[in-house]
Amino acid sequence: MPKLDKSQQAFCDAPAVNIRLLAPAGCGKTLSILHRCCALHRLASSRATRFLVLTFTVAARDELKARLTEDPEFASIRDHVEITTLNAWGFRRIKSQTRNPRLLTNKDNKHFTILNQLAPVWAKHKAVKDAIEKRSSRTKEILEIMDALKALGFDHTRIKSAEEFNAHVQDLIDLELGWRLEELWETLIKIGILTSRPKDGNDPQGFLKRVYTGFYKFWLEATDQLIKSATFTLEDQKYFAFIDERQKGEDADKPLTGVAKYDHVIVDEFQDINPLDLNLVKAIVERHRATVTLVGDDDQAIYEWRGTTPVYILEPERFFASRFKTFTLQTNYRSPANIVTLAQKLIRHNQRRVDKDTQAFQTAEAEIRVEETEDINASLDLAAELVAEHIKPDGSPTRIALIGRKKAQLIPYQVYFASKNVPFCAAEDLQIFLSKTFDQLLELLEIKQRADQRRRPREVAADLLELCNLVKRYRLNNAQKEQLDGHFRRSVFGKICDSIDAVASYRGPLAGPNVGGRTSIEFADAIRSYLDATTVADAITALSCNFEGLAADFGKAEEDIFFKDPPFGQLAEYAQRYGDDYLQFLDDIETAKDHLAHVPPTDDEAPDSNDVQKRPVHLMTALRAKGKEFETVMVLDCVEDMWPMKYAQTLAQFEAERRVFYVAFTRAKKRVVFQTAKRLGKRTAAPSRYLSEIGLL
């Protein structure tokens, strides 16, 4: 790569004005940012110039710091450039402005804070009070909603009245963030703070009034109380800093000078900011009267599920009330020429974007192919072949990534590679194998495996009780368990499979009144259908169909990630290779779990340099692939309803999904394999439209 190419030089030589730098992946963004600081430093040679470079991850911060420290070309600006994450900048402000601040970082502290510290506040708000007193575990959801409102730009000091609340809601809808509000309102309904809205959708203002009176007024008081008591969440690192910085800017009698002043603020990955991030950046820029440079790529805006929006980088003048000069880095130094071409061909199907003419620096081309497989077993064989090429005994291993759209897609590959002793890295922050409910699913399979064995009555009773506990959505309470256990001990035989009638004959309360034993019969039927299954795959399918306690449940997902997307389909399809060998299936799952007990740090801010990360095989979702690169990328299940996800309905959602696919396959340096499937489980699958858009089908 040359020192600076033409597009990089144009950016670096620009006058000291507000700039939007569009920086596609692999175009030398880090180098360009630091050379820009050098150029501005030279322009202001008569006085010291200070730069604030804000990143959103520790990894990005460390990359910039390393380049600044190690490259002698940047020696002249080392003492003038501050590089930090937005959260770290905010926490430094908290420490300077409060005494003995307490940061809420674990579950117990958060629970205590809501349940006890905020008790005088929620006691005055009936809807919140009733929800907490009915189920104290709701504290987690309540604190998360409080943080989400801050992230969405609600302000307890300026947005107080119902009119101000409604106006901000409309602003968020205009920013295409209305869906995020709907998620929050649905959560408030599920935890019992709000009642359900009319099915016909009429009277939206009436519903917003209930949100305001039922929860938002509590949020105003609770947020104020926590700040006054120096108690902060991670989101408060930015929220407190924003309010404090804005107030200092408004109270200032004269501009900042000297070492206290930033002359230039540079914001990296600007396409991934949310309303709170924007507010804090604006407050810093306005107080310091600094220029601002917004660096990012609207085509890589893939974190909208966090409440971010690409609108900010598409229309910066609208939010900063200033003119911006736009520069675009035009040379991709990372990717082979044909990957750059296909990426451009794909992303140009999006309408809401800034068009870019990105050219490849490399003349070499990657191997690109589409592989259609019959089912998951054929897909595993394909992956094994690719992996074998990267772990040859006579050479150094190279890195390959298997990238899925959903976490559940990765589970069969985790089990398969672990059972084959293939070292891999599954750096997922939501490890479903480590959930308590997944352990219970395995326990049910163990019960199935021993169902025909003769055992002591109390052991049979315990197994039946475990099965009954997961038939319905909510588990049995202690009183129901005691009565049912007593009944089983008097009624069961030596084998579980011979004792199902003991469930049907029970007449006590069971997940409700159990009138005429109807509920008992339902329980018995569900258990019988499960125990009658022959193969491992059939047993898993029976659990998914008849055991509501294992079904998807977004309310329960707050406590256990298993419920967000139960992996029954993937497990059942994978389990077909085991036939009726339950023990081998369970052994392989346990091997995979043991492997995953040593997963690397999973925070987005974690460095990418530890020993586990250096393993040759990486399994990840597309959202975790951003910023990484591999010799080979295998994109899993390139079919409709996966790429794009089936929830996508609107133009904006389809464009967001296209950006995710764009990010996924552009991680490759030498080879991309798009794996399509004829079937996903029992469903016939059609190839993803994106393969047609880039001309591969």
Task: Name each region found by the language model.
Residues M1-R102, H288, T341-Q344, T666:
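P-loop NTPase Walker
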Residues G26-I33, C37, H41, S322-K325, ...:
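Helicase P-loop NTPase motor core
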